[in-house]
Protein backbone atom coordinates (compact mmCIF):
# COMPACT_ATOMS: atom_id res chain seq x y z
CA UNK A 1 0.00 0.00 0.00
CA UNK A 2 1.26 3.46 -0.90
CA UNK A 3 0.09 6.76 0.62
CA UNK A 4 0.80 10.46 0.22
CA UNK A 5 -0.35 13.87 1.46
CA UNK A 6 0.62 17.04 -0.43
CA UNK A 7 -0.47 19.43 2.37
CA UNK A 8 1.26 19.31 5.77
CA UNK A 9 -1.26 21.85 7.12
CA UNK A 10 -4.11 19.37 6.54
CA UNK A 11 -2.66 17.07 9.20
CA UNK A 12 -0.81 13.79 9.52
CA UNK A 13 -3.33 11.62 7.65
CA UNK A 14 -2.45 10.43 4.15
CA UNK A 15 -4.49 9.01 1.27
CA UNK A 16 -3.89 5.82 -0.70
CA UNK A 17 -2.36 6.10 -4.17
CA UNK A 18 -1.56 3.41 -6.75
CA UNK A 19 2.01 4.50 -7.39
CA UNK A 20 4.56 7.04 -6.28
CA UNK A 21 7.68 8.52 -7.77
CA UNK A 22 10.71 8.58 -5.51
CA UNK A 23 12.91 11.61 -6.14
CA UNK A 24 16.15 12.46 -4.35
CA UNK A 25 14.04 15.00 -2.46
CA UNK A 26 11.53 12.35 -1.32
CA UNK A 27 8.14 11.26 -2.62
CA UNK A 28 6.99 13.53 -5.41
CA UNK A 29 4.14 15.67 -4.09
CA UNK A 30 4.30 14.47 -0.47
CA UNK A 31 4.47 17.01 2.34
CA UNK A 32 7.39 15.24 4.06
CA UNK A 33 9.65 15.57 1.03
CA UNK A 34 12.53 17.98 0.67
CA UNK A 35 16.28 17.88 1.04
CA UNK A 36 16.12 19.74 4.36
CA UNK A 37 13.61 20.15 7.18
CA UNK A 38 13.27 21.98 10.47
CA UNK A 39 14.47 20.06 13.52
CA UNK A 40 11.76 19.05 15.98
CA UNK A 41 11.42 17.52 19.44
CA UNK A 42 13.26 14.35 18.35
CA UNK A 43 16.45 16.41 17.94
CA UNK A 44 16.35 18.72 20.97
CA UNK A 45 19.51 17.19 22.45
CA UNK A 46 21.45 18.11 19.31
CA UNK A 47 19.77 21.27 17.97
CA UNK A 48 17.47 24.10 18.95
CA UNK A 49 13.93 23.43 17.64
CA UNK A 50 13.52 24.81 14.13
CA UNK A 51 17.18 24.47 13.10
CA UNK A 52 17.50 23.52 9.42
CA UNK A 53 18.85 19.97 9.10
CA UNK A 54 19.18 17.29 6.40
CA UNK A 55 15.87 15.49 5.83
CA UNK A 56 16.51 11.82 6.53
CA UNK A 57 12.76 11.36 7.22
CA UNK A 58 11.52 11.65 3.62
CA UNK A 59 9.63 8.35 3.67
CA UNK A 60 7.73 6.56 6.47
CA UNK A 61 7.43 2.78 6.08
CA UNK A 62 5.28 0.49 8.25
CA UNK A 63 4.26 -3.16 8.11
CA UNK A 64 0.85 -4.82 8.04
CA UNK A 65 2.02 -7.18 10.78
CA UNK A 66 3.17 -4.46 13.18
CA UNK A 67 0.01 -2.37 12.61
CA UNK A 68 -2.03 -5.46 13.55
CA UNK A 69 0.14 -5.95 16.66
CA UNK A 70 -0.47 -2.33 17.72
CA UNK A 71 -4.24 -2.71 17.24
CA UNK A 72 -4.21 -5.92 19.27
CA UNK A 73 -2.33 -4.31 22.14
CA UNK A 74 -4.73 -1.35 22.06
CA UNK A 75 -7.73 -3.69 21.81
CA UNK A 76 -9.19 -1.91 18.77
CA UNK A 77 -10.20 -3.45 15.42
CA UNK A 78 -7.42 -1.84 13.39
CA UNK A 79 -4.78 0.87 13.20
CA UNK A 80 -4.98 2.16 9.65
CA UNK A 81 -1.76 3.33 7.98
CA UNK A 82 -3.54 6.53 6.93
CA UNK A 83 -3.89 7.45 10.60
CA UNK A 84 -0.19 7.21 11.44
CA UNK A 85 1.30 9.12 8.51
CA UNK A 86 2.65 6.12 6.60
CA UNK A 87 3.88 6.43 3.01
CA UNK A 88 4.40 2.71 2.46
CA UNK A 89 3.01 -0.42 4.07
CA UNK A 90 4.91 -3.67 3.60
CA UNK A 91 4.18 -7.28 4.41
CA UNK A 92 6.61 -10.10 5.03
CA UNK A 93 9.64 -8.20 6.39
CA UNK A 94 9.94 -9.54 9.96
CA UNK A 95 10.38 -6.89 12.67
CA UNK A 96 10.45 -4.09 10.10
CA UNK A 97 10.79 -1.45 12.84
CA UNK A 98 14.05 -3.03 13.96
CA UNK A 99 15.82 -2.90 10.59
CA UNK A 100 19.27 -1.47 11.27
CA UNK A 101 20.22 1.99 10.00
CA UNK A 102 21.68 1.95 6.48
CA UNK A 103 19.54 -1.04 5.43
CA UNK A 104 18.30 -0.64 1.86
CA UNK A 105 14.81 -1.28 0.52
CA UNK A 106 15.01 -1.73 -3.25
CA UNK A 107 12.07 -1.86 -5.67
CA UNK A 108 11.80 -3.44 -9.16
CA UNK A 109 12.42 -0.07 -10.86
CA UNK A 110 15.74 0.19 -9.01
CA UNK A 111 14.36 2.90 -6.72
CA UNK A 112 16.02 2.52 -3.33
CA UNK A 113 15.32 3.87 0.15
CA UNK A 114 18.00 3.93 2.85
CA UNK A 115 16.67 3.35 6.37
CA UNK A 116 17.70 6.17 8.68
CA UNK A 117 16.21 4.81 11.89
CA UNK A 118 13.22 3.44 13.72
CA UNK A 119 10.25 5.82 13.69
CA UNK A 120 9.43 6.16 17.36
CA UNK A 121 5.74 6.74 18.14
CA UNK A 122 4.39 10.18 19.00
CA UNK A 123 1.09 11.60 20.23
CA UNK A 124 -0.26 12.88 16.89
CA UNK A 125 -1.50 9.50 15.58
CA UNK A 126 -3.12 8.89 18.98
CA UNK A 127 -5.45 11.85 18.36
CA UNK A 128 -6.53 10.43 14.98
CA UNK A 129 -6.94 6.90 16.37
CA UNK A 130 -9.04 8.26 19.25
CA UNK A 131 -11.27 10.15 16.80
CA UNK A 132 -11.89 6.88 14.95
CA UNK A 133 -12.22 4.73 18.10
CA UNK A 134 -13.83 6.92 20.78
CA UNK A 135 -12.86 5.93 24.32
CA UNK A 136 -10.81 2.97 23.06
CA UNK A 137 -7.59 4.36 21.69
CA UNK A 138 -5.63 4.70 24.88
CA UNK A 139 -1.93 4.02 24.92
CA UNK A 140 -0.81 4.37 21.30
CA UNK A 141 2.69 5.53 22.20
CA UNK A 142 3.30 2.51 24.46
CA UNK A 143 1.57 0.05 22.10
CA UNK A 144 3.53 1.27 19.07
CA UNK A 145 6.98 1.24 20.69
CA UNK A 146 9.32 -0.70 18.36
CA UNK A 147 6.37 -1.25 15.99
CA UNK A 148 5.85 2.09 14.18
CA UNK A 149 8.13 1.28 11.28
CA UNK A 150 11.14 3.11 9.96
CA UNK A 151 11.92 6.38 8.22
CA UNK A 152 14.39 6.80 5.42
CA UNK A 153 15.67 8.81 2.50
CA UNK A 154 15.84 8.22 -1.24
CA UNK A 155 19.16 6.87 -2.50
CA UNK A 156 18.00 6.13 -6.06
CA UNK A 157 15.03 7.63 -7.85
CA UNK A 158 12.33 5.58 -9.54
CA UNK A 159 8.71 4.48 -9.62
CA UNK A 160 7.13 2.36 -6.90
CA UNK A 161 3.79 0.65 -7.48
CA UNK A 162 1.42 -0.83 -4.96
CA UNK A 163 2.22 -4.54 -4.69
CA UNK A 164 5.85 -4.22 -5.80
CA UNK A 165 8.28 -6.75 -4.36
CA UNK A 166 10.90 -5.24 -2.05
CA UNK A 167 14.44 -6.59 -1.81
CA UNK A 168 15.94 -5.84 1.59
CA UNK A 169 19.70 -5.33 1.95
CA UNK A 170 21.00 -5.48 5.53
CA UNK A 171 24.51 -4.11 6.20
CA UNK A 172 26.94 -6.05 8.33
CA UNK A 173 27.06 -4.48 11.78
CA UNK A 174 28.43 -5.16 15.18
CA UNK A 175 27.30 -3.66 18.44
CA UNK A 176 29.05 -0.51 19.57
CA UNK A 177 30.07 -1.29 23.15
CA UNK A 178 30.74 2.31 24.23
CA UNK A 179 27.26 3.85 23.95
Locate each region found by the language model:
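Glycine-rich active-site loops that engage anionic ligands at enzyme catalytic sites
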Residues: 91-94, 98-154
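Short, glycine-/Ser/Thr-/acidic-enriched flexible segments
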Residues: 27, 66-67, 95, 112, ...
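Short, charged beta-turn/beta-strand-edge "cap" motif at the junction between a beta-strand
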Residues: 111-113, 119, 167-179
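Electropositive, beta-rich accessory/interaction domains or terminal extensions
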Residues: 1-108, 178-179
